[in-house]
Amino acid sequence: MSLLAQLDQKIAANGGLIVSCQPVPDSPLDKPEIVAAMALAAEQAGAVAIRIEGVANQQATRAVVSVPIIGIVKRDLEDSPVRITAYIEDVDALAQAGADIIAIDGTDRPRPVPVETLLARIHHHGLLAMTDCSTPEDGLACQKLGAEIIGTTLSGYTTPETPEEPDLALVKTLSDAGCRVIAEGRYNTPAQAADAMRHGAWAVTVGSAITRLEHICQWYNTAMKKAVL
């Protein structure tokens, strides 16, 4: 059975939660062994897959989890706004470190390596390709190029302002077009994740609300300060 078919079965049985284990950079939690521990806890709690940034983090996580890993490498480039898995060598390193799925930036923006070239390299390794997109046009273009999974990851992050709510309309549009959609980006409550599934999401990735302690504390502190002012 293919990995995609296995995931279809797991999602149907367990609800489709993917946990992104990406600590705040330079946080006390930003250590491969801690990332791996968070990933294992997420797997034991029912996550069907884990999203991991960085080769060292992925190597540590691969050693302890059995669920599929979505691997990415983030870089800050001087000549491109693209940050997620921008280079062939990133794909190769993630493949060697044990990724099952490799996610790349799938937006229509200047980049060092074309999307189709990165997708071909992922498939060369026999892995599934996911594209992190921001618009319906991005997602549909990537689907035509052969990406098996389309993420709404970058919706709201390629524009001057980022909305507070997740982009459910994008989930529905891509799902209606026949894409396997991973809803991602600002899914901070179980109710929002459930809404994404009702809008046609194949799965939902949750990051900050589960694995970024600093963000969660900030949400509580902000709300509590407002309550007493």
From Swiss-Prot:
Enzyme Commission number(s) of this protein: 5.1.3.9
InterPro entries: Aldolase_TIM (IPR013785), NanE (IPR007260), RibuloseP-bd_barrel (IPR011060)
Any one GO CC term of the record: cytosol
Catalytically driven reaction(s): an N-acyl-D-glucosamine 6-phosphate = an N-acyl-D-mannosamine 6-phosphate
GO biological process, one term: N-acetylneuraminate catabolic process
Gene3D superfamilies listed in its UniProt record: Aldolase class I
Record keywords, A-Z: Carbohydrate metabolism, Isomerase
Pathway participation: Amino-sugar metabolism; N-acetylneuraminate degradation; D-fructose 6-phosphate from N-acetylneuraminate: step 3/5
Top-level lineage group: Bacteria
GO terms of molecular function: N-acylglucosamine-6-phosphate 2-epimerase activity
Family label: Belongs to the NanE family.
Record function comment: Converts N-acetylmannosamine-6-phosphate (ManNAc-6-P) to N-acetylglucosamine-6-phosphate (GlcNAc-6-P).
HAMAP family to which the protein is assigned, alphabetical: ManNAc6P_epimer
Name the UniProt record assigns to this protein: Putative N-acetylmannosamine-6-phosphate 2-epimerase
Organism: Escherichia coli O139:H28 (strain E24377A / ETEC)
Lineage of source species: Bacteria, Pseudomonadati, Pseudomonadota, Gammaproteobacteria, Enterobacterales
